[in-house]
Amino acid sequence: MANFGLFITHRALPGQRDAVRAVWERFMRPAITENPAHVDYFYGFSADDADVIRVFQRYVDRDASQAFLNHPSYRAYLDEVTPLLAGSPDVSEVAVMWSKN
């Protein structure tokens, strides 16, 4: 079982969450879909904060997560999304011990 995961919280500038998602859809969704090292990926809006996006990613291993940071689509995503965010994301690494498949 792939056991490396990331919980990520992004905070968009007020009123910019949909714009952040549009950038994510353009660059990240296709890159993630085509990346076999992304085992699972969940992208969602916070139910209690209109500016927060929460993400869970599971990779085959930590090295694969680091390698994805050099993907051209990820670099383009960062260039366009950074001005829409209130700061750097909160990122927590986790060892996935179990998942329901």
Feature annotation, model-predicted:
Residues 2, 42-51, 77-101:
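Glycine-rich beta-strand-turn "strand-cap" elements at beta-sheet edges
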Residues 3-11:
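Active-site-flanking beta-strand signature of metal-NTP-handling nucleotidyl enzymes
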Residues 11-21:
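Short, surface-exposed ligand-recognition loops at beta-strand->loop->(often short) alpha-helix junctions
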Residues 13-15, 46-48, 60-62:
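Short coil/turn motifs at secondary-structure junctions
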Residues 26-39, 58-92:
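An amphipathic, aromatic/His-enriched active-site/gating alpha helix that lines ligand/cofactor pockets
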